[in-house]
Structures are given as C-alpha cells and as structure tokens.
C-alpha cells in the first residue's frame, strides 16, 4: 500500500496528495463499496468507523491496513451471518411475505439512512427479499422456482463471502 500511495502522489496528473481530505473521501467510498445497499452496517457501526476517516492516509503511508481490515471483518461477519440465516430458513421467510401490504423500498441506497438498529437492518433485508420475490413473480416464475432461484443466489453469495482472501480485501480497498 505504501508503494501505491507513493506512485499516486508522484504520478497523478493533478499532483494529488493522499491527505486527510482524500482520506475522508476514500473512507466513504470504501464503506459504500462494501455495503452499497446499507444492509450490513448500522448507523452505530458507521459512527464507530468515523474515527478512521482521517487516519486512512496516515496508515497507508506506513503500510498499515488495520482500519480497512477492521471495517471489512465486521462486514464479512455480518454478511456470512445474514446469508447463513437467510439460506437456512428461506421458504418460511418467503411464505410470511404479505404482498397485499403496501410497502416502499428506496432502490437508491444513497438516499436511505443507515439502519438505526439490528431490527431496522433486518427489516431492510425483508424488504429486499420481498422485492426479489416480487420481481421473480412478475417475470412469471412459479413459487417453488422462486424459492429455488433465491436459495441458489444467496448460497452463491455466501460461498463467495466465505472464500474472500486478504488479497481480495486489499483489492477492494485499493480500488475504492
């Protein structure tokens, strides 16, 4: 990471410096890259991570990634936990969905606040599940095929989450 920062500062056509201002932008882009739908982090998590906004540049210049790894580890833990829970009880969760009830889901997550609690995060997950089921229904899928499709989708996401390596984390961090 030190070499990457040095090259960025030496070769950028605008003479870009990785300073506190850029660190703050990088922090936001990294959080958004990990959790674009805002379904893994709560507002409390984001508030706790804010202590790193002005540290990413300093850490990178020293070759440290501890802040990035701490953020990523919580993301991965929540992702695996949620996808495991979802795949283990998908059919009952689908069966409980009420399509007569009018509900809204902001599809542009940047306009949504971070969930205030675990319950609010789970509610957002429920709305995304309902949206996925509804889209498959509208595409003409039968109920059993919907369950199978979503189970495969979530199992694949879980498998990918469990296979992430430290190089993958570095790549996500360096490319945001």
Predicted regions, residues:
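Flexible, low-complexity junctional segments that flank or bridge functional domains
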Residues: 1-176
């Amino acid at each position: 990471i030190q070499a990457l920062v040095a090259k960025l500062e030496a070769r950028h056509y605008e003479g870009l410096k990785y300073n506190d201002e850029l660190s703050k932008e990088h922090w936001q882009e990294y959080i958004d890259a990990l959790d674009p739908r805002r379904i893994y982090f709560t507002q409390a998590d984001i508030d706790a991570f804010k202590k790193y906004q002005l540290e990413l540049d300093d850490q990178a210049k020293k070759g440290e990634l501890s802040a990035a790894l701490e953020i990523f580890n919580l993301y991965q833990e929540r992702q695996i936990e949620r996808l495991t829970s979802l795949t283990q009880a998908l059919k009952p969760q689908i069966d409980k969905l009420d399509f007569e009830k009018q509900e809204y889901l902001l599809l542009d997550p940047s306009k949504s606040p971070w969930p205030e609690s675990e319950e609010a995060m789970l509610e957002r997950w429920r709305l995304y599940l309902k949206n996925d089921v509804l889209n498959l229904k509208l595409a003409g899928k039968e109920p059993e095929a919907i369950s199978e499709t979503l189970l495969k989708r979530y199992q694949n996401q879980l498998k990918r989450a469990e296979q992430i390596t430290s190089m993958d984390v570095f790549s996500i961090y360096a490319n945001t």
